Amino acid sequence: MQLDNILSQLFENQALTKAESQYFFEQVIQGNVSNEQLAGALIALKVRGETIEEIAGAVEAAFANATAFPAPDYAFADIVGTGGDGQNTINISTASAIVAATLGYKVAKHGSRSVSSKTGASDVLSALGINVTISPQTARQALDENNLCFLFAPLYHAGFKHAVPVRQTLKTRTLFNILGPLVNPAHAKRQLLGVYSPEVLKIYAETVRTLNHQHSIVVYGSGLDEVAVHGETLVAEIEDDKIHYFSLIPEDFGVQRHSIEALRGGEPTENAEKITVLLQGKGEAAHIDAVAVNTAMLMRTFGERDLKANVQRVKDLLRTDKAYQTLQNLAQYQ
């Protein structure tokens, strides 16, 4: 296979096979593709729209070149969004992961520094005193003992660094936004995946189905890559190799509506302060409800289907400081 041929195909608006995509992204990960070539390829993919085969090929390339994580044999999940929704909200997925872990669900959260928003998952966790660069063995220990670990993407997918200058220069969503959530190094088979557009929802669901997940849910929340408390959430639930599409509104979770402005965040320190207050049992109503609906949906991947009951469990927890204890315990792993 030749890099030049693949680039020519892309520039002529032809889709790549899964094998061609895997080859191309392995070349990217190994540093064999120039910034100019990569920028051209990513834009060509974006303008045409990435196919399931192209995304799946990139996922395979990432896994084939990733640092291994000692995956457990017990059930665990991941909650992660593509980012790139441009809304700069507080880190709802990160807070939800901490809450779910406190309720007894094991979560291996995959994430990185922000590339296209103000504050990524690792930015806010660092501000909360968490060492995001612990070894895979230590992270596994945290998951075993504390129900929660954070897997810092650059540590496991070192080759992605070759794409960072291009991503930062382009300042637009690319296949890498789509890729990140799908390449959890623990190979999570249960995931709550947030996407940045309704168009990506279907292609994401189809891609997840090819990756043999046990029970994963893809959501798009009226402009957010999360379950929304300000409007409708489009849902694709992937279970037993079937995809079920439906939509939910805040009332389906038993919560009231809040404006998206009430969820706005900022720099890592600001988001960290808001999350700390929330985990200590003193959170703002909008923050509590946003975390409750997302945690409720994550619980569903473990078979807890009653969303209203799940929300109530979260709200009861967030009247205490137990979730803050989970965060403090996580900080002990260095």
Curated annotation (Swiss-Prot):
Gene behind the chain: trpD
Source species, domain of life: Bacteria
Alphabetical keyword list: Amino-acid biosynthesis, Aromatic amino acid biosynthesis, Glycosyltransferase, Magnesium, Metal-binding, Transferase, Tryptophan biosynthesis
Origin species: Actinobacillus pleuropneumoniae serotype 3 (strain JL03)
Protein name: Anthranilate phosphoribosyltransferase
Quaternary structure note: Homodimer.
Xref: InterPro entries: Anthranilate_Pribosyl_Tfrase (IPR005940), Glycosyl_Trfase_fam3 (IPR000312), Glycosyl_Trfase_fam3_N_dom (IPR017459), Glycosyl_Trfase_fam3_N_dom_sf (IPR036320), Nuc_phospho_transferase (IPR035902)
Alphabetical GO biological process terms: L-tryptophan biosynthetic process
Essential cofactor(s): Mg(2+)
Residues that coordinate or bind Mg(2+) 1: 93, 226
Gene Ontology cellular-component terms listed: cytosol
